[in-house]
Swiss-Prot record:
EC id: 2.1.1.-
Enzyme kind, highest EC tier: transferase
Protein name: O-methyltransferase dpfgI
GO biological process: methylation; secondary metabolite biosynthetic process; terpenoid biosynthetic process
Classification via PANTHER family: O-METHYLTRANSFERASE DOMAIN-CONTAINING PROTEIN (PTHR43712:SF4), PUTATIVE (AFU_ORTHOLOGUE AFUA_4G14580)-RELATED (PTHR43712)
Binding sites annotated in the UniProt record for S-adenosyl-L-methionine: 232-233, 257, 279-280, 295
Single Gene Ontology MF annotation: O-methyltransferase activity
Functional pathway: Secondary metabolite biosynthesis; terpenoid biosynthesis
Keywords (A to Z) from UniProt: Methyltransferase, S-adenosyl-L-methionine, Transferase
Transferase in keyword set: yes
InterPro entries documented for this protein: COMT-like (IPR016461), O_MeTrfase_dom (IPR001077), Plant_O-MeTrfase_dimerisation (IPR012967), SAM-dependent_MTases_sf (IPR029063), WH-like_DNA-bd_sf (IPR036388), WH_DNA-bd_sf (IPR036390)
Length: 378
């Protein structure tokens, strides 16, 4: 029997990936994605890799601005560039070039000459959260990335740990921190808050925190007693999800965030959730709550600031209180691309970092917390 050509062998393997991929769980999908990215690095040159990534984000941002993805999603039939140009008041030739690039990245599908339709991912790109995410990546993170090489060369011996004098300040020519800058730019602030809706919902903290077991001995007979405090909780997505799953557990649920964020939250919040302006640098005003929760917040603080913030939480905790930190742990070896990219986003925009297990352990020891449970989810 003749040996198959290498390309045919690869085609057979890829066919299996396409068939089996939809049945994988979250953990297995992450492993396969990493393997596929690794395989791709063996069949393209570094320059091809750079070209593949360089233009897509700008095109996604433009497509979101003019309603391109919404138009494709809302249509039952493929649309020509001429039709899209008239509908969106855009140049048909430019649209064709943009759509070809997006199709090459599998973000839309080309069905014929200058004719395109929506892919599955196009549905996501048409959503407000993803549109805001594109703006956040392009308008803030892409700009800080451009300043990153020069900043690092100019500060070779220094760590990036000052949110008032870092890469963001060089990129935006400002003395303000990223958070302070956003306060003066409500449109960008809105993009950031909307993009938080993209947070993962499959296999998350609610699936691993034994909430019902933890509250068996906790009494909430006092109507003012607080069950759950979400510190830095944005628009309240996690509070809402908590109350949606545990609607009958007594106790108040309180969302805390910066005043400008709290002002944007529609009132009243569902399930009786309370919104409270709060800054991590201040003493924690809610005393003796059962759960103090923080999700993807400490990565935005320097080591010294995060230690100070955790001390403020510790000072408010009672004997039955628990601190729940929901954040990424960078593995010691073999970190995935997404985790490393997030680490660079934190460094470039807010002088923050995604931390390793040892770095998290140092935070715990410094604040004299006892680790009751360490749960991993994807």
């Amino acid at each position: 029997m003749a040996q198959q050509a290498p390309t045919m062998q690869i085609d057979n393997l890829l066919a299996q990936v396409k068939v089996l991929g939809s049945s994988l769980n979250v953990a297995d999908r992450a492993k396969v994605q990493k393997s596929l990215l690794d395989a791709l690095s063996h069949v393209e040159t570094p320059y091809e890799h750079m070209l593949r990534l360089s233009g897509s984000l700008a095109c996604i941002r433009f497509g979101a601005d003019i309603g391109l993805f919404k138009a494709l999603v809302e249509s039952q039939e493929p649309l020509t560039c001429s039709y899209l140009g008239e509908k969106l008041n855009a140049n048909a030739n430019i649209l064709g070039r943009i759509l070809r690039l997006l199709a090459s990245a599998r973000l839309v599908k080309q069905t014929g000459l200058d004719t395109f339709t929506a892919e599955k991912i196009t549905q996501e790109l048409a959503a407000q959260a993803m549109e805001s995410g594109a703006h956040l990546l392009f308008d803030i993170h892409n700009r800080t990335y451009q300043a990153l090489p020069d900043y690092l060369c100019e500060n070779k011996s220094k760590d990036v740990d000052n949110m008032h004098n870092g890469i963001f300040q060089k990129a935006f020519s400002t003395d303000l921190s990223c958070y302070e800058y956003l306060v003066h730019n409500p449109k960008l602030q809105g993009f950031m808050q909307d993009a938080m809706k993209l947070n993962q919902t499959e296999g998350d903290w609610l699936s691993v925190l034994p909430m019902e077991d933890e509250i068996k001995r906790w009494q909430a007979s006092d109507p003012d007693r607080v069950l759950f405090v979400d510190i830095g909780g944005g628009m309240g997505h996690q509070c809402i999800r908590l109350r949606g799953k545990y609607s009958d557990i007594p106790g108040r649920v309180v969302l805390q965030d910066m005043p400008i964020t709290v002002e944007r939250i529609p009132k009243p919040m569902p399930h009786g959730i309370e919104a409270m302006p709060y800054n991590f640098e201040e003493p924690q005003p809610i005393k003796n709550a059962k759960f103090y929760y923080t999700r993807n917040v400490l990565h935005g603080l320097t080591d010294s600031a995060s230690i100070a913030a955790l001390k403020n939480v510790a000072a408010a905790m009672g004997t039955e209180s628990l601190l729940v930190i929901d954040d990424l742990i960078i593995p010691d070896e073999g970190a995935c691309t997404q985790a490393c990219q997030l680490d660079f986003v934190m460094m470039a925009s807010i002088a923050g970092k995604k931390r390793t297990r040892d770095q998290w352990e140092d935070k715990r020891k410094y604040n004299e917390y006892k680790c009751k449970r360490n749960s991993q989810f994807l």
